[in-house]
């Protein structure tokens, strides 16, 4: 009987440890679904986890401001919590292509991209083939001014130069056009990239793959 009681206690202890381990994740998901104090949850579209290997690193509190909403840009809302990421999903080996979400961005002076691209410190007109990558894929500027190949689901492809980081850790300020932090799986392409792929810019988002050129 004593042995059975000991085994039962061990099983109960293990069960309690398991519950304690998963509670923080459950709480985070609850907040992402729209919970949290003040009625403001995580921005739903940005709260979806793109990869189980890349979890949120934190959150920032939204502040609204002078946000250029061109190209379907999402503008920060006061008091809303936005998740941040220090990583991106793993890059596929062998140049097979890494799944990503293509978004639309103007890198021109006065466009919705905010300040000048960080790789070169200069702006690019909408006819140039340039992109920004989520923080993890930007990889500490290692892809600055390097080419990537972007492929649409329909088979079209284009080569574009990386000129900026789509910042997954900061946002909701003037440097980021008062937009939320970038999701962890974004290739932010100029209008020229969308045109070269034959995509409808009004859609604002498209499933693509990308690889280093």
UniProtKB/Swiss-Prot annotation:
Nucleus found in the keyword field: no
Domain of life according to the entry: Eukaryota
Protein localization: Secreted
Coiled coil: none
Signal sequence range: 1-32
Keywords: Secreted, Signal
Any single Gene Ontology cellular-component annotation: extracellular region
Principal cellular location given in the protein's record: secreted
Family matches, as InterPro entries: Kiwellin-like, RlpA-like_sf
The family this protein is said to belong to: Belongs to the kiwellin family.
Name of this protein: Ripening-related protein 3
């Amino acid at each position: 009987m004593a042995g059975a009681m000991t085994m039962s206690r061990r099983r109960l202890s293990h069960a309690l440890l398991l519950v304690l381990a998963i509670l923080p994740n459950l709480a985070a998901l609850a907040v992402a679904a729209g919970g949290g104090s003040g009625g403001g949850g995580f921005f739903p579209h940005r709260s979806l986890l793109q990869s189980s290997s890349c979890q949120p690193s934190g959150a920032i509190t939204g502040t609204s401001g002078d946000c250029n909403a061109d190209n379907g840009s999402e503008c920060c809302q006061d008091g809303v919590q936005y998740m941040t990421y220090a990583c991106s999903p793993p890059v596929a080996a062998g140049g097979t292509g890494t799944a990503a979400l293509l978004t639309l961005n103007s890198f021109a002076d006065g466009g919705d991209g905010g300040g000048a691209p960080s790789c070169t410190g200069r702006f690019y007109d909408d006819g140039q083939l340039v992109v920004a990558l989520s923080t993890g894929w930007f990889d500490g500027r290692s892809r600055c001014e390097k080419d990537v190949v972007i492929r649409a689901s329909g088979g079209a492809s284009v080569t574009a130069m990386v000129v900026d980081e789509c910042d997954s850790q900061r946002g909701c300020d003037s440097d980021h056009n008062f937009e939320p932090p970038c999701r962890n799986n974004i290739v932010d392409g100029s209008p020229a990239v969308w045109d070269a792929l034959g995509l409808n810019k009004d859609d604002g988002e498209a499933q693509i793959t990308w690889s280093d050129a």
